[in-house]
Amino acid sequence: MKKITRIGIGGPVGSGKTAIIEAITPLMLDLGIKVLIITNDVVTTEDARHVQRTLKGVLVEEKIIGVETGACPHTAVREDPSMNLAAVEDMESRFPDTDVVLIESGGDNLTLTFSPALVDFFIYVIDVAAGDKIPRKNGPGISQSDILVINKTDLAPYVGASLEVMDRDSKFMRGDKPFIFTNCKTGEGIPELVHLIHDMALFDVPIKEAS
């Protein structure tokens, strides 16, 4: 049976996790990467509905589902990921030719991580509007994620944040682990993020050459 890669995407409330998924999915599909999406919310499936609306005509609605966890966001993806595991297994059984499942956690804090029983790869998303001190606050999401995404770069001048400081501190906290600046409104960094994901997590998936 084909091994389907599972990628967890976590980060604080409002950091742009859903927007990142909505931005990278069309580019992944253009490369021939087959995608499923699972979102997590505590008491609704609002993120899933938002993704379905945004990606209408790009990804069929049945390949995007929401999990209503009813619990603390990190519990549902770390301590007891049973609801997400059930959702993943159901989706993979219905779409066995899939290459990757993107699993978005509910908004949480800098301590968020995913259970290795649930995901193979972990992307952590922070945003510039939270302040340029966030990378040096550290935490598992900052230092241990496979890729750190620093989103909403366009907001830096409005909140007095320095991208140079965030770049410096991210290098210090992460060592050789990659991080990338993105802006989902303009597309800045999104193609680079997609290729980074492919090279690190989906390297065995053939991709289409750019025409």
From Swiss-Prot:
It is found in: Cytoplasm. Keywords: Chaperone, Cytoplasm, GTP-binding, Nickel insertion, Nucleotide-binding. GTP binds at residues 11-18. It comes from the Bacteria. Its main location: cytoplasm. Signal peptide: none annotated. One of its GO terms (cellular component) is cytoplasm. GO terms for molecular function: GTP binding; GTPase activity; nickel cation binding. GO terms for biological process: urea catabolic process. Gene3D superfamilies: P-loop containing nucleotide triphosphate hydrolases. Facilitates the functional incorporation of the urease nickel metallocenter. This process requires GTP hydrolysis, probably effectuated by UreG. Belongs to the SIMIBI class G3E GTPase family. UreG subfamily. Homodimer. UreD, UreF and UreG form a complex that acts as a GTP-hydrolysis-dependent molecular chaperone, activating the urease apoprotein by helping to assemble the nickel containing metallocenter of UreC. The UreE protein probably delivers the nickel. PANTHER family: UREASE ACCESSORY PROTEIN G. This is Urease accessory protein UreG. The gene is ureG.
